[in-house]
Every structure is written in C-alpha cells, then in structure tokens.
Design a protein with these regions (language model features):
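Short, glycine-rich nucleotide/cofactor-binding loops
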Residues: 1-7
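Nucleotide-activated chemistry modules centered on ATP-dependent adenylation/adenylyltransferase
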Residues: 7-308
C-alpha cells in the first residue's frame, strides 16, 4: 500500500486494517515526514530508494525548466516491480475520483496535471500489468469511488494521525525552502485540505492541526477563489473539484462557528448569490461512484465502513 504522508493513504491503510487485510506500508524516496507516518501505522514497512540523475540538476544550471512528471505513474511502476519480486498480489494506491478532473483553462479546455492519478491511467495501467506482467497482480486505487470530501469525512473519524500527517506539497519540494511546520498555510493543498476537513471535524481540532484558521485570513482570498473557480481556474495541484469546494464553503456558511470567519462571510455575500442552491449540497458529493478496479469482495467489506 503506497503511503504519501497525507490523509488519503492513511484512510486506505486504516480501511484495509479494519477489513483484516495484511498490508505492507510502502513509500519511495527519503521523506522523513512519510517515514514518521508509516511508522505511526504500526504496520510492516518497505522503503524503496529512488535517486534522481545528477544530469537533471546540471540541466537546471544550464537554464532548463523543471517540468511536472507523472510521478504517480513512475511510483506505480516501481511498486509493481517490488510486488513481483516479493510475490505480492496487490498494489494499492489512494487516488480519489476527483483526481480524474482537471482545470478548465479559458481558450484551451481541460488540463489535468495529475492525469496519472486519474481513472483513465489507473484502468490502462492496471490492464497492462495483468496482460503483460502478472495476470494475478491487481493494481488499483482503494479510494477511486470516493470524492475528496468523502475521503475527508473518513479521515476525520479518528485523530490518531493529526500530529503526523501533511498534504502540504512544500514538504516534498526537491529544491527550495520547506515549511518549518508540517503545513505552510499558503499553498493550494493547505487551502483545500483545511476547507475539505472543516465540515467534518470540530473547529478547534482543525485549527490545532494547521496552527491557525486559514478561513479567517483575508490574504488567503485569492487562493480560495481559485479553488472555488471564482474568477480563476482550479490550481495545478492535487485538490478537489470546484463543486466540492463550493459545497464545503456553503456548508460552513450555515454553521454558527464558521459563518463569521472573513472568507466564509465573503463567500456568503459575494459568491454564493451567483450560484444555484441545489449545486451547493454536500450530500450528493459523498455518494460512491461505480467506476473502480477494487476486487468485488473487498469493496463490499469496505463500502459499509466508508458509509458509516
């Protein structure tokens, strides 16, 4: 089971544990944050080394730009190799259905920078593995039927990982500064995870995780506008769909403990009146999708746990 240090993989790990499935928590690279999360699970672990070619950094020095590589595809291939070598029959990732939807760019159309986290890649790669590598090796995402909000709801059921997890991508930059704390509080991932968790956990707990209330800071307005697809497009980050952000914000606007925060109040006054009320309901976004590669018997056991 791949672990990335964020909420998604921890939801998968605990779901499999509750279903009685033996698992090895696996990560690629040397992140100490991921190691701490993996050790926190108390399960067997596997850390696979991956070293970037020094020529890449030489190209940087010569002026070459860094590009976004399909890192989930790379890691999927590495973990399939590890599974074959170790005689394991399943490789499990934690990509939710929201990953299949990109950013809507004016004049261009949809651009999905996280395509290798989406359903099209999972289906194609999983079929390739079974046709050409090992017929009995299942590759799938355990969270594919779930939206980001459904994953957040599941994560909020336990505080066991509150002091260990982080979805902030600045923790994983190869070059440049990393946040002193686990959450930088200003990137799209921090913005979205805070918003996604807010409807499902006590405010005091969420603020304790992040160290501050991101929704009561007017300087974060531009970042949240992008998540809401208000006068901007969804960021090129692994965040939920615009409709999920809008529904989460509308939910908070109706809650006494959130509605006075400056960005929630701004949403209620400026953005919500332009939206159809029936598109702001959170419940329809928590319904499971039927498109996934999870083995049927396992999904039946997991489904009840996710729905509870």
């Amino acid at each position: 089971v791949a672990i990335g240090g964020g909420k998604d993989s921890l939801v998968s790990i605990e779901a499999l544990r509750n279903a009685g499935v033996a698992e090895t928590v696996t990560w690629i690279g040397g992140s100490q944050l991921i190691r701490a999360c993996a050790e926190r699970t108390g399960l067997p672990t596997l850390n696979i080394g991956r070293t970037l070619a020094p020529e890449l950094f030489e190209l940087n020095r010569q002026g070459a730009w860094n590009g976004h590589i399909p890192v989930t595809a790379v890691n999927s291939a590495i973990m399939v190799l590890a599974a074959v070598v170790q005689g394991v029959d399943q490789v499990v990732f934690s990509n939710e259905r929201s990953a299949s939807y990109g950013s809507q760019i004016a004049g261009t159309g949809e651009v999905n920078h996280q395509w290798s986290k989406g359903w099209a890649f999972e289906k194609a790669f999983g079929e390739y593995v079974q046709q050409h590598i090992a017929a009995d090796l299942n590759y799938y995402s355990l969270l594919r039927p779930l939206s980001e909000l459904a994953v957040a709801r599941q994560f909020a059921k336990t505080d066991f990982y509150d002091a260990h997890f982080s979805s902030c991508n600045r923790n994983f930059h190869i070059l440049g500064e990393r946040p002193v704390n686990r959450w930088c509080g200003v990137c799209p991932k921090c913005h979205f995870v805070f918003l996604a968790l807010a409807p499902f956990m006590p405010k005091i707990r969420l603020v304790r995780i992040f160290g501050r209330n991101l929704l009561d800071d007017m300087e974060q307005a531009g970042g949240y506008d992008a998540l809401l697809e208000f006068q901007d497009h969804k960021p090129f980050e692994c965040v939920g769909e615009g409709k999920e952000s809008r529904a989460a914000m509308a939910t908070l606007a109706s809650r006494p403990d959130w509605k006075e925060d400056v960005l929630v109040k701004r949403f209620a006054n400026l953005i919500q009146p332009t939206l159809a009320a029936d598109e702001l309901q959170i419940e329809p976004l928590l319904v499971f999708d039927g498109e996934h590669r999870i083995p049927a018997a396992l999904w039946e056991r997991l489904r009840a746990n996710f729905a509870a």
